[in-house]
A protein has these predicted regions:
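Active-site helix of classical SDR
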Residues: 135, 139-142
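Adenosine-cofactor binding site in Rossmann-like domains, unifying the SAM/SAH pocket
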Residues: 31-49
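NAD(P)H-binding glycine-rich loop region in Rossmannoid oxidoreductase-like domains
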Residues: 46-83, 93-96
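Conserved Rossmann-fold NAD(P)-dependent oxidoreductase catalytic core, especially the SDR/UDP-sugar
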Residues: 88-133, 159
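NAD(P)-dependent short-chain dehydrogenase/reductase
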Residues: 114-123, 145-214
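N-terminal Rossmann NAD(P)H-binding glycine-rich loop of SDR-like oxidoreductase domains
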Residues: 6-26
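Phosphate-coordination loops involved in phosphoryl transfer and adenosine-cofactor binding
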Residues: 4-5, 99
Length: 214
């Protein structure tokens, strides 16, 4: 699909990944890019979802309520509800508005807690996610189910991209919600500034993770 003359919606376009997606779209010559702000367009509201996809050709759904271990432990209900509502309503209203392509961002947190390492793409249905991440991971996982169902019944063109853990410039360094790499960078930076000889790192060091630089 040639994107140059398409009207493109990027939810979460002001976020860490979204800024990079918008920059790349601009480099491809796309000029009509809509980036709604969460304060003006709450995607948990179905009416807002309906309005924001009106006249749109392609949707990149990158908006999410997301954070690190601390946030997942503190607000599992919010993470489940917010991400489920945003995703399922936006996809549905995109279908209703005859959007030509819907690209959603999934999460590696949807994969089972117990699986072989390295795991394959097909392993996503082979078990329950790690309990701390399960509300967020399962809410995102439902986009896979909905995408397949809408493709089969309505021939709606949607895909769910599941990257590994992301990091890079413009990442979230808020200690209450950041992921492991920015959290460690901040802890080490603060320790150096305050002449501390140690930092607190969660876990026992045994988990294996992979990361993707954005």
């Amino acid at each position: 699909m040639d994107l140059k003359n398409k009207k493109i919606l990027v939810t979460g376009g002001n976020g860490f990944l979204g800024k990079n997606v918008v920059r790349n779209l601009e480099n491809l010559g796309v000029s009509d890019i809509i980036i709604p702000s969460s304060s003006d367009c709450d995607l948990r509201n179905m009416g807002n979802c309906k309005k924001v996809v009106d006249g749109i050709d392609v949707v990149f759904h990158l908006a999410a309520h997301v954070g690190g271990i601390g946030l997942n432990r503190e607000k599992p209900g919010e993470l489940f509800f917010d991400n489920l509502m945003m995703g399922t309503q936006l996809l549905h209203e995109s279908k209703m508005a005859n959007v030509k392509k819907f690209i959603a961002l999934g999460t590696v947190c949807s994969y089972p807690k117990f699986t072989q390492v390295p795991f394959s793409e097909d392993d996503i249905w082979n078990g329950y996610p790690e309990e701390t991440n399960a509300p967020y991971g399962l809410a995102k996982k439902m986009l896979l189910v909905q995408s397949k169902a809408y493709r089969e019944q309505y021939d709606f063109h949607s895909i769910v991209v599941i990257p590994t853990n992301l990091y890079g410039p413009d990442d979230n360094f808020d200690p209450s919600s950041s992921h492991v790499i920015p959290a460690l960078i901040l802890k080490i930076s603060n320790a150096k500034k305050n002449n501390l000889d140690q930092i607190e790192v969660w876990g026992d060091g045994s988990p294996t993770r992979d990361f993707l630089f954005v």
